[in-house]
């Protein structure tokens, strides 16, 4: 990790208190892009949406993603979700993922890798809908370029309304 740092001040005299110079890491400017989506999810169906910056950004590298989701559902129901990275676009969600557990099927294991996962369970009084939400902050390591794809995939046990917002931290 230290190999890509710059060592300035090597020409200075070395002192016991301070070495040849202080290293510094070059910081690339990061832009934040917020995207807002809403959808109606059907019962027992695997659905997903792509997480990417909106607008006319041609070349980018996603470094971090902050995912915020708000759900309105009856009590006693469950929503499973996973965040996956894929080398090619996913067209058929049910062909790529198993139904309740959202595991990657064997035919797609070479192109899809799971980054994060979670679940949301609702509780409350029967007969009334309750609103649940979750926040997930995902660090993407070396980053995801514009040629790769990042998806959030969900499975619900009941039909519900979903509001999904994500803030993408990108390097241009």
Swiss-Prot record:
Superkingdom is: Viruses
Q: Where in the cell is it found?
A: Virion
Q: What are the record keywords, sorted? A: Capsid protein, T=1 icosahedral capsid protein, Virion
Q: Name one GO cellular component term.
A: T=1 icosahedral viral capsid
Asked if the record carries the keyword RNA-binding, the reply is: no
Record-stated family: Belongs to the nanoviridae capsid protein family.
Task: Give the protein's recorded name.
Answer: Capsid protein
Q: What is the lineage of its organism?
A: Viruses, Monodnaviria, Shotokuvirae, Cressdnaviricota, Arfiviricetes
